[in-house]
Amino acid sequence: QTLDYVQPFQQGFGGSFELATRIAKKTPGNLNQIFYTICGSTAVETALKICIAYHKARGHGQRFRFVGRERAYHGMNIGATSVGGMINNVKTFASILMPGVVHMRHTHLPEHKFVKGQPETGAELADDLDRIAMNFGSENIAACIVEPISGSTGTLVPPKGYLNRLREICDKHDILLIF
């Protein structure tokens, strides 16, 4: 018999190993580990924890800050709501959100309203991360989290060059980038 779903906590199954191998083959670089979660919210929470653990393992335990983006939605859990930029969620749950989260501006500029595909302008918005790193100290920032395409606010595609610029800034400051 076959189960529809089994929580893969501390155990593995043939199908999960097969899927992990297929995913690894389709990703760039030398990805050799896959971590399954039960939903997107849990995936975000896990990614945040992995970032903190990664920096602690490297002797950089002071890296506790996260940078999100305005209008972003990353899930319903506390960490995901904290790094998300949905203003009503932030206002409603402000007293229990994670400290040390800062938000960059969103990438949906007024001139992008009727643009199909990737807008030509706006890549410089990624420089918000550079300014945040200077203001708060890049040595204190664990990761930056963005939706490559923002689905919660109308399927907003980032400007050309934005994600590449964000990657460059993260690399410059040793900040992890979560998609």
Positions of the model-derived regions?
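Glycine- and other small-residue-rich loops at beta-strand/loop junctions that grip anionic moieties
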Residues: 8, 12, 36, 155, ...
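Catalytic PLP-binding core of fold-type I/II PLP enzymes
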Residues: 156-179
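Glycine-rich, proline-tolerant flexible connector loops at the mouths of alpha/beta enzymes
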Residues: 148-157
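Short, conserved phosphate-binding/catalytic loop or strand-edge motifs used
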Residues: 17-20, 145-147
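A glycine-/small-polar-enriched, mobile loop at the entrance of the PLP active site in fold-type I
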Residues: 1-17, 150
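PLP-dependent aspartate aminotransferase-fold enzymes
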Residues: 21-143
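Active-site flanking residues adjacent to catalytic metal/cofactor-binding acidic residues
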Residues: 69, 146, 179
